[in-house]
Amino acid sequence: MSETLKTQPYSKRAEVHPSPVARRLFNLMETKKTNLCASVDLTTTKEILDLLEKVGPYICLVKTHIDIVSDFSYEGTIVPLLALAKKYNFMIFEDRKFADIGNTVKSQYKGGVYQIAKWSDITNAHGVTGSGIVTGLKQAAEEVTDEPRGLLMLAELSSKGAIAHGKYTEETVEIAKTDKDFVIGFIAQNQMGGSDEGFDWIIMTPGVGLDDKGDALGQQYRTVSEVMSTGTDIIIVGRGLFGKGRDPSVEGERYMKAGWNAYLARTNQL
């Protein structure tokens, strides 16, 4: 993201973005005044739905790991999830991290038990298998639904010792350039460039915390102001919202305000 794009309001970027998913997301963020994504790594449908009833008003996006839901069913899990997304006006991002050849990910995305392409606005993929992964996922989406879908590439990770950096990150960016309409951005800790070639990538950053600096399993947290200053568009927060002793409604509003104020400061709107 260039300095010019970095200081533009989300609504301005929505006006010219080639992806309908990105346009919808940017406009939603402006309408709700939030750039918060809730990461709901919970293992039952009830836990997920109950949490979203509490944080739904404060988020633009929910990030799911649907394959850890022990009682998953399309009717029992996805239908009410979609209803909550409509009720509270947020989008859905299934954090699937696809990492196989194009033909395989095509089947994984559109079929199986989860039918991800049918209900998730956004998903993500590693670049390790090359650009065929983008082609396969896009084809799957087009075969399953008329609704627009978007893909994030995993350029950088927030865990200690992650090898997604340097040359790997550079090659992942090159893969992203192969499809301007379907690839909407990155999971990353920093800007990924591209603006000089006409790309406006959405940067979503995990590992954001207002209180904790890390955990025992290698997660490293950065503050909201830190990540926003390095080009993040959407902050991804999980345990900071619903960890032990936390009130999700209170924390949701707290992170929403922190993220939005950091965005307003970056875009000179304060």
UniProtKB/Swiss-Prot annotation:
InterPro entries: Aldolase_TIM, OMPdecase, OMPdecase_AS, OMPdeCOase_dom, RibuloseP-bd_barrel. Keywords: Decarboxylase, Lyase, Pyrimidine biosynthesis. Substrate binds at residues 41, 63-65, 95-104, 221, 239. The active site is at residue 97. CDD domains: OMP_decarboxylase_like. PROSITE patterns: OMPDECASE. Belongs to the OMP decarboxylase family. This is Orotidine 5'-phosphate decarboxylase. It comes from Candida boidinii. The gene is URA3.
